[in-house]
Amino acid sequence: ETRAKQFLKVLKDTKGQPESMIQRVYRQIRETSPESNILVATGKSQIDSIKSQVGNKVDVVLEPERRDTFPAIILSCSYLAYEKGLNEDEAVIVMPVDPYADTGYFESLKKMEELINKGTANIVLMGIKPTYPSAKYGYIIPNQDGSVERFQEKPSEEYAQKLIQEGAMWNGGVFAFKLNYILNIAKKYADFSSFEEIKAKYSDLPKISFDYEVVEKE
C-alpha cells in the first residue's frame, strides 16, 4: 500500500524531472489556486510517503481506521474548522488524490467553488463528458437546469450507451460544499466541538461512502 500508484515517480514535471501523481496534483492545484489550503486524508501506512514527496506543504489528517469516504470527509472538515480555524462559510472541495488531468480540470474546481459561494446549491458535483460507454464508472444523469435527476452506479456497457444518449456524465467523484454544511450533517451522528472529539468518536460514524450518505440524499 505504501507503494501505491500515486507515489510512483513515473511522470515528468514541467522541467522534465520525475514526479509522482501526488506531486503532480499538488503542483497543478498550486498553479491554479495558489492560496488554497490543501489537506490530505489518509491512513497511517501512507503518512511517510506523503511527507517525503510533498513535505510540510500540505496538512495531513490521519484516519483512525478505514471507514469509507463519509467519515473521512467529516474528519477532514472538522480539522479545517477546529484546527485550521477556517470560517465555516468557506467553500471546501473534495477530490481524489490521483486524477491524471490537464489544467482545465483544476480550473473547473475554481468554477465549482464560485457556484458554492453564490449559493447555487448545497453541493456541486463534477460531471465528466464520457468518451465511451464505460461499465467502470458511475454516472450522473442531469436535468436541463444542471441539477441532478438521478445517479447510476457502474451500468452495463449497453445501458451506459443509453445513458450517454440521455446526456449522462461520468461521476468525477469531486464535491464542493460549504464547511458548515458538512459540520451540520456530522452533528446528526456525533456530538462534538473539537477535532479531537470527532476523532475519538470516529468509529461511531457510519461506514459508508459520501455519495450514498450525503450526495444521493440531497
Language-model regions, residue ranges each:
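Residue-level preference for short coil/turn positions at secondary-structure junctions
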Residues: 3, 34, 56, 88, ...
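Catalytic core of tubulin tyrosine ligase-like
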Residues: 129-130, 139-218
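Beta-sheet entry/capping signal
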Residues: 37-39, 91, 122-123, 174
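Structural signal for conserved beta-strand scaffold positions within catalytic alpha/beta enzyme cores
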Residues: 9, 62, 125, 150-153
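N-terminal glycine-rich phosphate-binding loop and ensuing alpha1 helix
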Residues: 1-50, 56-67, 79, 106-107, ...
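Alpha-helix C-cap/termination motif
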Residues: 32, 53, 83-86, 118-119, ...
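Short, conserved micro-motifs enriched in small and acidic residues
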Residues: 16, 66-71, 172, 205
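Conserved beta-loop-beta/alpha segment of the NTase-like Rossmann-fold superfamily
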Residues: 58-144, 183-188
